[in-house]
Amino acid sequence: MENHSKNIKIFTGNSHPELAREIAKALNIPLGKAEVGTFSDGEISVNIKETVRGCDVFIVQSTCSPVNNNLMELLIMIDAFKRASAGRINAVIPYYGYARQDRKAKSRDPITAKLVADLLTAAGADRVLTMDLHAAQIQGYFNIPVDHLLGSPILAKYFVEKGLADRDDVVVVSPDLGSVTRARKFADKLNAPIAIIDKRRPKANVSEIMNIIGDVKDKVCILIDDMIDTAGTITNAANALKDLGAKNVYACCTHGVLSGPAFERINNSAIEELVMLNTIALPEGEGLNKFKSLSVAPIMADAINRIYDDEPLSGLFQD
C-alpha cells in the first residue's frame, strides 16, 4: 500500500495492541506513540506522544472485557485527539461491546448500545469502523458514518482452503433461528446445504437444544455464529449434532468473547476446531489446541486506506 505516514496515524489502547500493530504494518506505517495507563486511584491516563495536528487518526480498540475500562480508554483517547487538533478521528472497534443490549427485551431495560453510540459521538469521533455487529441496526444509532465489515467471507475462505467446499458430505449449521441468514450466506460460499437448530433459552447464558432441522447424519458439520460468549449454545449444538450421527463438527465465529466456562466447555465438547477472527485477543496459555485465530488486519487496513483516500468501501461489504 502507498505510504501515508505524514497524514494517517494508527493508535491503540490496551484492548488489542497486537492487532493495531498488524494493521499498521499492513499500511506500511509505524504505530502511533501514546501512553494509555491508569493513575494510582484507577482513573485512566492518556498521553499522546507525537503531533497529530491535521492528521487522520484511527484508534484501534475493541470494547471487550474489561468492557468498561476499554470503553473509557477509547472515549478518553478520542477526547485527547480532538483537543490535539486531529483532522478526523476514526474509532476502529473490531468488537463493539454492549451490542447485545440493542432493544428493550423487557420493561424498564436500557438500550445501552444506543448509549455507547451517543458517548462515542459526544466524545468527538467522526466515524466508526467495526465488524459484525450483533445487531446490524446499531448502525442507525449513530449520527456519524459507520462502516460495518463482515467476517464470514474470511471464515468461509479458511474452510474452502481446508477442502470443505463443493462436497456432498458438508452441511453448515445455524445454532439458532437468529443466525439462519448468516448460515445461508456462509453455506452459499461453500456450496453446501444448511441445517438449523431450534433452541429455547430459559435464562441468560443458558441454552437448551430442542430440535435439529436438516440432515446431519454422517456429515461434516460447520456451526457458524457472530460471537461465542460462554459457549453454552455452540457446545450444546455440537454435542447434539454428534449424538445424531455427525461425522465431524467444526465451529466458527467472528468474535471469540469466551467468558466464564467457555474454554472448558469447548475443550470438553464434540467440536474438533473452533475458528475465530482476532477481533478480540486470544489469551496465551495451554489448552488452546482446538482454537484457530484468523487475522482481520488485512481487511481493516484496506478499509482504513479507503477511508483515508475517500474511496468507497462497498467492495468490502460483500458477504
From Swiss-Prot:
Catalytic reaction(s) noted: D-ribose 5-phosphate + ATP = 5-phospho-alpha-D-ribose 1-diphosphate + AMP + H(+)
Primary site of residence: cytoplasm
Pathway(s) per entry: Metabolic intermediate biosynthesis; 5-phospho-alpha-D-ribose 1-diphosphate biosynthesis; 5-phospho-alpha-D-ribose 1-diphosphate from D-ribose 5-phosphate (route I): step 1/1
Domain of life: Bacteria
Residue numbers annotated as active site: 199
The keyword Nucleotide-binding is assigned to this record: yes
Details of cofactor binding: Binds 2 Mg(2+) ions per subunit.
Keywords: ATP-binding, Cytoplasm, Kinase, Magnesium, Metal-binding, Nucleotide biosynthesis, Nucleotide-binding, Transferase
A Gene Ontology term for the protein's cellular component: ribose phosphate diphosphokinase complex
Localization, UniProt: Cytoplasm
Pfam family for this entry, one: Pribosyl_synth
Residues given in the record as ATP binding sites: 41-43, 100-101
InterPro entries attached to this UniProt entry: PRib_PP_synth_CS, Pribosyltran_N, PRibTrfase_dom, PRTase-like, Rib-P_diPkinase, Rib-P_diPkinase_bac
Residues engaged in binding D-ribose 5-phosphate: 201, 225, 229-233
Entry keyword annotation includes Nucleotide-binding: yes
Required cofactor(s): Mg(2+)
GO molecular function: ATP binding; kinase activity; magnesium ion binding; ribose phosphate diphosphokinase activity
Listed EC numbers: 2.7.6.1
PROSITE patterns: PRPP_SYNTHASE
Role: Involved in the biosynthesis of the central metabolite phospho-alpha-D-ribosyl-1-pyrophosphate (PRPP) via the transfer of pyrophosphoryl group from ATP to 1-hydroxyl of ribose-5-phosphate (Rib-5-P).
Family of this protein: Belongs to the ribose-phosphate pyrophosphokinase family. Class I subfamily.
Subunit structure: Homohexamer.
Protein's name in the database: Ribose-phosphate pyrophosphokinase
Organism: Clostridium perfringens (strain 13 / Type A)
